Amino acid sequence: MSANKNIWIIRLGVAFVCVAIGAAQANEKDGSAVTSGNWSLLGGGNEQHYFSALKDVNKSNVKNLGLSWFTDMEAGDGLVGNPLVADGVIYQGGPPGKIYANDLKTGKNLWTYTPEVQYDKDTSWTGFWGTHVNRGLAVDDDNVYIGSYCKLLAVSRTTHKLTWSSQSCDPKKMQAITGAPRVGGGKVFIGNASGDFGGDRGHLDAFDAKTGKHLWRFYTMPGDPSKPFENDLLAKASKTWGTDYWKYTKGGVSPWDAITYDEASDTLYFGTDGPSPWSPAQRAPDAGDELFSHSIIAVDASTGAYKWHFQTVQNDGSNMSATMHIMLADLPVEGVSKRVVMTAPKNGYFYVLDASTGKFISADHYVPVNWTKGLDPKTGRPIPSNEANYWERPGEMTIPLPGDVGGHNWEAMAYNPELRTVYIPSTLVPVTVVASKDTGELDLDYYYGMRPDATIKTQGDLVAWDPLLQKEKWRAKRSLPVNGGVLATAGGLVFQGTGDGHFEAFDANTGEKLWSFHVGGSILAAPTTVEVDGDQYLIVASGNGGASGMRGIPRLMNNLQSQGPARLLAFRLGGKTELPITSTPDFPKPQYPKPTSAMAESGRHIFNANACGACHGFNAEGSTPGLPDLRRSDKLDLAVMKSIVIDGAFKPLGMPGHPHISDADLQALQAFILQKAWTAYDTQQTLKTSDTGAQ
């Protein structure tokens, strides 16, 4: 059901009148249409359009694009942030808050800042996990800003030393910083992540950019109702969480990525995650909307005072976060140019909201959805459907769409104001969910859609979307569901990296693929483009990493051909540099016999219950080069495993100990890993035999 009919009938009548308005908007405010040698703000400007007015590289000559240089980076957990460029230097962030500064023209590393991370003995799982995820950094005239182990760091661009460090969350309370900070108005803004465990309340902080002084905090959910609320807003929000809600949930609703600053109105827009635990059956029975979960929130950037919110999903059970990329633009609404917010959260809908009031303007879905029957055309509120409500059917398999991975995750969209088109890296991952009849524990299969018998197939697309008509213009299918962020240019091109390791260019009008280059590693980062000395450079970071890998589903975002090292790559017309050939080593024959199926299945439950798969992959296949493929491990001796898994021997490396795991549980874990190791080895040997026989 489309939720845009009422206003678009009016809008179509004024479409021709609005053409002139659109042309005048081609050079957007706040530097979104980048023409210089700098790309110092995330997405190229405060509006975060990921659009450049550069057009030296265009549809007629993009076939001549070649690699100018590449640099292999010491980043075991991959690079996924949008590279920023200021004064001839590329700044790239990586885990655990590392800053790389490289020369724009040569790729030579100029300096690297590595933060000191000393894990507290009480560091939570999320605190450890978060140090393996970094989605970028921020830059201003003085400093580079990055998150690390719940701290916001400012590092001088001149001295390359720490200017200040400020605490923003508590790694002992299931919190971490994984998103890129944003800068504006002399301030630095940062949110936090909970890893979906909800150990503490989500909040967004503002710091003075020069001194690191904490200026304000906005809590995204109410706290313990037995204590005074921080303000009347949270007191009112508490009424939406149900009776005795603090008995069921003590956190979540994290603003872990999307933050957008509007200089003209001094407004900060950010998105929030969902409540914890995931299942509504495990939260207050009479819970309502649970504000401000899954919301777009606008606050005064100077004070943190609330302006408005728009909630995309109420009382959610499928982790359909609204923390995805938020853009600002000027669009013709009923014949008048209006400042709008555009966003495509996980729930599968693309929204256009009034930036001043938060009022719903329009929305429609860009991937299949079954969690709602549609949206109210006036308010945008979802019309209830129980098709995705697994918590109402314990013991039965349910496939919520688009589900936990989302129709669009954190990877950046792009907006071409000249064509008035948004380009969405969309995802469809049908995840089967079965809630235990006894405990309510969720059993999820993220790889269901890759099975031959799947009724709904896993799919990734690059979607060109008309935000006025809420209509698809074209769709380019990708080989894997999780792919990189997008860049649009005035050269009539759209650039995107892919999970299978390709960097590609498309015709912005038709979706025709015009150019492709295999970089050897998975790409989640959005590209950057700048011009220097008459050459237009396209810059992109590669290397397995990011939330998708860290959520234990690496097969959705890479394959055997895209597991190369983390790299920074620059392309220009006439580039002639060649990449070295990389290969994946064979699986070694496991050193222990095959386990029984029953023991391995017991180990699978222990593996999942302790969130081992979130770092090491649900099939123990490893998420990033920095988190080992356990199927290849030479540390499966039970005594060695005990020292690592139970006693925490690798705690300094970010691997927590699990003292609650028994010796019997450890044996079951060993059996599960061995089963996966033998499966990988046997499959490899079968393929080798088949290849030999075919010759």
UniProtKB/Swiss-Prot annotation:
Key word Heme present: yes
Molecular-function annotations in GO: alcohol dehydrogenase (cytochrome c) activity; electron transfer activity; heme binding; metal ion binding
Catalytic reaction(s) noted: lupanine + 2 Fe(III)-[cytochrome c] + H2O = 17-hydroxylupanine + 2 Fe(II)-[cytochrome c] + 2 H(+)
Enzyme class name: oxidoreductase
Residues binding heme c, per UniProt: C612, C615, H616
Cofactor remark: Binds 1 PQQ group per subunit. Binds 1 heme c group covalently per subunit.
Compartment(s) of residence: Periplasm
CC cofactor: pyrroloquinoline quinone; heme c
Keywords, in A-Z order: Heme, Iron, Metal-binding, Oxidoreductase, Periplasm, PQQ, Signal
InterPro entries: Cyt_c-like_dom (IPR009056), Cyt_c-like_dom_sf (IPR036909), PQQ_b-propeller_rpt (IPR018391), PQQ_rpt_dom (IPR002372), Quinoprotein_ADH-like_sf (IPR011047)
SMART domains in the record: PQQ
Domain of life: Bacteria
EC id: 1.17.2.2
Signal sequence, start to end: 1-26
Subunit structure: Monomer.
Function of the protein: Catalyzes the first reaction in the catabolism of the alkaloid lupanine. It dehydrogenates lupanine, which can then be hydrated to produce 17-hydroxylupanine.
Protein name as it appears in the record: Lupanine 17-hydroxylase [cytochrome c]
Source species of the chain: Pseudomonas sp
